[in-house]
Structure formats: C-alpha cells, structure tokens
C-alpha cells in the first residue's frame, strides 16, 4: 500500500465523493416548494410534490430548458470533480473494499467453523437423564 493509502484505514476515512447534481425537476421543485406550501398549508408533502410535478410537466419547453441547462452545468462540474476524486482515491477505495470483503469472508468462515464445532459438541454430549421420582411412599405415622 502506498504512503497516501496508508493514511486511510477504512472507507469512512476517505474524503466523501462529490454529490450528484439535482435534475431539472428537483431544481424547479426546490424553487417553488416553499411557495406552494404556504399557499396550501393543509396539504401533505407528497400531495404538494405531486402538484409541483404536474406543474413541471405542464411548463413550456422554453422554461423547462432553463432548468435542464442548470442541471447540465452542474452535471459537467460534478463529472469533473468525480473524475478527479476517482483519479486520486479510486485505487485506494478499491483496495479498502477488497480488504473489507476479505475480512468479511474470514469472519464468516470463522463463524461457520464455530457453529459446526458447537453442533459437534452437542451431538457428543449425552443427553442428561431425567430426574427419577422417588417411588417410595412416605412411612405411615404410628398412632
């Protein structure tokens, strides 16, 4: 493992990957959601989102294009950042995933071996004989 890789012991230690950009619909939704919520305070969130979805579908193509263009710009930035992340940390991530997979296999193997051993010991140990009741009756009392 390289010197850079040695500072990352687990996948959680790696810097987080860039987040994917929001689609045109989600950009639109984030712009109008608060307004729709105040217009219809009795509606539940899924109902509001459903209405926003219908609105977005009904938007003229020219207006939709504005949101799609914003998405494409964010996507280009994301792709660039993601490529840089993969170039810098991709091999380290793969190595750490492989290590985690091997560790899990080993743990599973040990667990199964312990399970088999337990089954063997149960079969070898004789079952405890049930306690016998004393058939003798209590002696009769003398008068």
Curated annotation (Swiss-Prot):
Which residue ranges does the record annotate as region Disordered? 1-22, 100-143
Q: Name one GO cellular component term.
A: nucleus
In the record, Blocked amino end (Ala) modifications are located at 70
* PROSITE patterns tied to this protein: HMG_BOX_2
Q: Which UniProt keywords apply?
A: Chromosome, DNA-binding, Nucleus
Q: Which residues bind DNA?
A: 18-86
Main location class = nucleus
Pfam families (alphabetical)? HMG_box
Compartments where found:
Nucleus; Chromosome
Protein origin, superkingdom = Eukaryota
Care to name a GO molecular-function term for this sequence?
DNA binding
Specify residue ranges for compositional bias: Basic and acidic residues: 100-120, 131-143
Q: What PANTHER family is this protein classified in?
A: HIGH MOBILITY GROUP PROTEIN B3 (PTHR48112:SF32), HIGH MOBILITY GROUP PROTEIN DSP1 (PTHR48112)
Protein name per Swiss-Prot or TrEMBL: High mobility group protein B
